[in-house]
C-alpha cells in the first residue's frame, strides 16, 4: 500500500508505495483512510528533533489524525461493520493497569501512540483495536472528523474546569489553542483572550471567536484586560504554547483561586515564580490526550449544537502533494492542513 514513512533518521518524511498492508487481529478493525490531517507531532517527527530521535523507531508509518471507512473487522469484533465512517483514538492503552481498570484510560502508563510507536494513518489502511474506533455521525464533515484528535486535546483542556461566565486566557494560538478558544465561547465563557506572537494565527483566533487576540510582543495584556472591563485576573488559564515566558505571564494575570490546564510541553526546565501559584491558591492540571470516551462524546455533541470549527482548516492538498502540506505547517502560517487520499465517500 501507499504510505508516508519516516524511513531515515534525518529530516523529512517519504512516500513509499510498497508498504505491507497491516494485519488485522481478532479484536482489530482495518480502516481505509479517506482524509488525513497533519499534527504538530508529525512536524516534530519530520524535523527529527531530539524528542523524535528518542521516541520514534525507524522505519515508521506516521500520522494519527484521520477519517475513513471500515474496511475489515477481526473475527471477534461485533460493534462495527464494513463501510461505516469512523475515526480513531490515537492512544492505545493496556486495559489492565489501575487507571485503565478505573476508566481513566487517558492516564494509562503503558500508552502506545498510533503513528509514533505503532504504524499510523498516513496510509491507505490503518489497523487499530476495535475499542479505539469511534463512529462519526453523518452530519459531521470529513474535514472536521479528520481533526478529531487535536479537537479532542482542545476539548479535554478547555473543559477541565467550569467556564460558564468565566474570563479565560489561552496562551498559544496554534490550531489546538484556537479550537479551545472556540469551545470556551461555545460553552459560555465571558471573555476569551488568546495570546501569541504570530499575527497569522492571532487572526485565526479572532475568526474562531476570541474576544481579543493579543500579540504580546507589542501589546500590553493588562491594558487589554482593562479595556474589557476586567477588574480582577483571569479565572481560567489554558496553556497551549509550551513557552516558558507565556506561562510566566499567565501566572501573573491569574485571579486568586484561578485554575490552569496545561497542554503545551516546554522544551526544557523553566524558572517559575511558585509564589504566584502558592499565594494565589492556583490549581494546576496537566492534560494528556483525550478522556476515553467522554471527550469524544462531548466533541460530537458540541458540533451538533452549533460549534463551528470550519475556519481552523486552512489548507487542503492531495496526499501526493503532502510535501506542500508539511511546508505550510512548518511555516507557521496555517491552521490545520488536511490531506485527501482521493477515496470516494
Swiss-Prot record:
GO MF annotations, alphabetized: L-threonine 3-dehydrogenase activity; zinc ion binding
Free-text remark on how the cofactor is bound: Binds 2 Zn(2+) ions per subunit.
Active site residues according to the UniProt entry: 41, 44
InterPro entries assigned to the protein according to its UniProt record, in alphabetical order: ADH-like_C (IPR013149), ADH-like_N (IPR013154), ADH_Zn_CS (IPR002328), GroES-like_sf (IPR011032), L-Threonine_3-DHase (IPR004627), NAD(P)-bd_dom_sf (IPR036291), PKS_ER (IPR020843), Zn_alcohol_dh (IPR050129)
Reaction equation(s) it catalyzes: L-threonine + NAD(+) = (2S)-2-amino-3-oxobutanoate + NADH + H(+)
Binding site for NAD(+): 176, 196, 201, 263-265, 287-288
Pfam families per the UniProt record, alphabetical: ADH_N (PF08240), ADH_zinc_N (PF00107)
Subcellular location: Cytoplasm
Magnesium in keyword set: no
SMART domains the UniProt entry points to: PKS_ER
UniProt entry tagged with the keyword Ribosomal protein: no
Pathway: Amino-acid degradation; L-threonine degradation via oxydo-reductase pathway; glycine from L-threonine: step 1/2
Biological function: Catalyzes the NAD(+)-dependent oxidation of L-threonine to 2-amino-3-ketobutyrate.
UniProt similarity note: Belongs to the zinc-containing alcohol dehydrogenase family.
Subunit composition and interactions: Homotetramer.
Name of the protein described by the UniProt record: L-threonine 3-dehydrogenase
Organism, scientific name: Anaeromyxobacter dehalogenans (strain 2CP-C)
